[in-house]
Swiss-Prot record:
It is an enzyme of class 6 (ligase). It comes from Schizosaccharomyces pombe (strain 972 / ATCC 24843). The lineage of its organism: Eukaryota, Fungi, Dikarya, Ascomycota, Taphrinomycotina. Keywords: Aminoacyl-tRNA synthetase, ATP-binding, Ligase, Mitochondrion, Nucleotide-binding, Protein biosynthesis, Transit peptide. This is Probable threonine--tRNA ligase, mitochondrial. InterPro entries: aa-tRNA-synt_IIb, aa-tRNA-synth_II, aa-tRNA-synth_II/BPL/LPL, Anticodon-bd, Anticodon-bd_dom_sf, Thr-tRNA-ligase_IIa, ThrRS_core. It catalyses: tRNA(Thr) + L-threonine + ATP = L-threonyl-tRNA(Thr) + AMP + diphosphate + H(+). It comes from the Eukaryota. The keyword Endoplasmic reticulum does not apply. It is found in: Mitochondrion matrix. Residues 1-27 form a transit peptide.
Length: 474
């Protein structure tokens, strides 16, 4: 184990944030002008997630809401896929998803300690209605994190040791009043979503829950091709809540879990959250750049402040006497900010999305605009997209659909192929007279970034390949 003094992470993007965002939102280049400009731009600029996102039309921004993202249809597809992926894994790891309010009274933030320690980052909302009741003229705050709300959910009913560990997940939007000069693309925002999770468990379960969470993190990042991880134990900061004994207990709990995990880890003195120590996970992307993403925080303070408890085994069996204990709270996020993680992933993949995560699965390119070829192209699109239902019917909830477009513009096949490759479609399907006659497809598929192969396939063969790609996370 190595020991380092407190350090600070800096954003890798040094461009003027406002200028870049207005450029992306209002003057974003077309795919072809991007290609021309690429000849003059350094690789670092070409790989910047903002450049790739503009080319692929993933999101836009507005000076009317700085630090917020408008996900366009293709960016929304990626975002939703990441959320769906996590939701599927939550079933394995025992998390129950909940939805919590966006706005809370100042009283809540004072109770949790956020108002005293995080006030500058909380957006205030003033109540000014002329109604004389206990709610009039109250000060509210947009939530910067979900933990106090999850404490309210935990406390909403009496809990027993039989329910523990209790694991909540939440994708609600969060707001933090970041300085305007710090805002940058997807990586630093004022409004964002986090794959937030909180585990309420007994003290005896701490090590197992943390080890299981570390395993979860490693599995997810391995799937995404990010196998290089660094773990940091961030300890008590100068500004904190709770007693020294409570902090020592929490830090020792994380330290023991890290030691038993077998992973290499480093102490990061004084960089914990104000309510508890944490494990920060750093991952390396394809270019060797390190990013802080996942986090695991151990918290004895919020359960104490919210007076959370559970009945023990003795309490359940003691008749009228109820013996109670305070649970431990573990904060955890696998991706962290989903928007920020998307920015990291865009650069890691250089915009070459794997099929299961792709916003553009296939494009059909008719060689001409004759009725015969266009009719077959539309039939192929309907079958491959897996939307073979009448307009009066409903698509089953559990049916996978695929994003298949037709580009029948009056341009040469070569030009349309170049455009589809700039947009990074996974499959290009050329349809001519021969394909219509034989009821086949001429398919070019992308493998290992830009390498491609071309095959003759039936619609059903290609559809089967789509299904296998998603099932295997390819």
């Amino acid at each position: 184990m190595m020991k380092l003094k407190k350090f600070q992470l800096h954003t890798p993007f040094a461009h003027s944030c406002n200028r870049v965002e207005i450029y992306t939102a209002r003057f974003g280049p077309t795919p072809f002008s991007t290609k021309a400009n690429n000849l003059k731009q350094p690789e670092s600029t070409l790989n910047d997630h903002r450049t790739i996102a503009a080319r692929q039309k993933l999101y836009t921004t507005s000076i009317l809401t700085p630090g917020s993202i408008f996900f366009l249809p293709h960016g929304t597809r990626i975002y939703n896929r990441l959320v769906d992926f996590l939701r599927a894994q939550y079933q394995i790891h025992g998390f129950e998803e909940i939805i919590t309010p966006l706005i809370f009274k100042k009283d809540l933030w004072e109770k949790s300690g956020h108002w005293q320690n995080y006030e500058k980052e909380i957006f205030r909302v003033e109540e000014s209605r002329n109604v004389e009741d206990e709610h009039s003229n109250a000060t509210y705050g947009l939530k910067p994190m979900n933990c106090p709300g999850h404490c309210i959910v935990y406390a909403s009913t009496e809990r027993s040791y039989k329910e523990l560990p209790l694991r909540f997940a939440d994708f609600s939007p969060l707001h933090r009043n970041e300085a305007s000069g710090a805002l940058s693309g997807l990586t630093r925002l004022r409004c964002f979503h986090q794959d937030d999770g909180h585990i309420f468990c007994s003290p005896e379960s701490i090590k197992d829950e943390i080890k299981n969470t570390l395993t979860f993190v490693k599995q997810v990042y391995s799937l995404l091709g990010m196998n290089k991880l660094k773990l940091y134990l961030s300890t008590r900061p100068e500004e904190h809540i709770g007693s020294l004994d409570t902090w020592n207990e929490a830090e020792n709990g994380l330290r023991e879990a890290l030691q038993e995990s077998g992973e290499t880890w480093i102490i990061n003195e004084g960089d914990g959250a104000f309510y508890g120590p944490k494990i920060d996970v750093m991952v390396a992307d394809a270019r060797g750049k390190w990013h802080q993403t996942a986090t695991i925080q151990l918290d004895f303070n919020l359960p104490q402040r919210f007076k959370l408890y559970y009945r023990t085994d003795a309490g359940d069996n003691a008749g009228s006497e109820k013996l109670i204990k305070q649970p431990v709270m573990i904060h955890r996020a696998i991706f962290g900010s989903l928007e920020r993680f998307m920015g990291i992933l865009i650069e890691h993949l250089n915009g070459h999305w794997p099929f299961w995560l792709s916003p553009r699965h296939a494009v059909i390119l008719p060689v001409n605009q004759t009725d015969r070829i266009l009719t077959y192209a539309k039939q192929v699109q309907k079958e491959l997209s897996n939307q073979e239902v009448n307009e009066s019917e409903f698509l089953p909830l559990n049916k996978n659909t695929y994003y298949v477009d037709i580009n029948a513009e009056a341009q040469s096949i070569g030009k349309r192929l170049r455009e589809s490759r700039l947009l990074n479609y996974n499959y290009e399907i050329v349809i001519g007279e021969d394909e219509v006659d034989k009821e086949i497809l001429s398919v070019s598929s992308r493998h290992n970034h830009n390498s491609r192969d071309t095959r003759k396939m039936t619609i059903q063969q290609l559809k089967k390949e789509f299904i296998e790609n998603v099932k295997a996370y390819r």
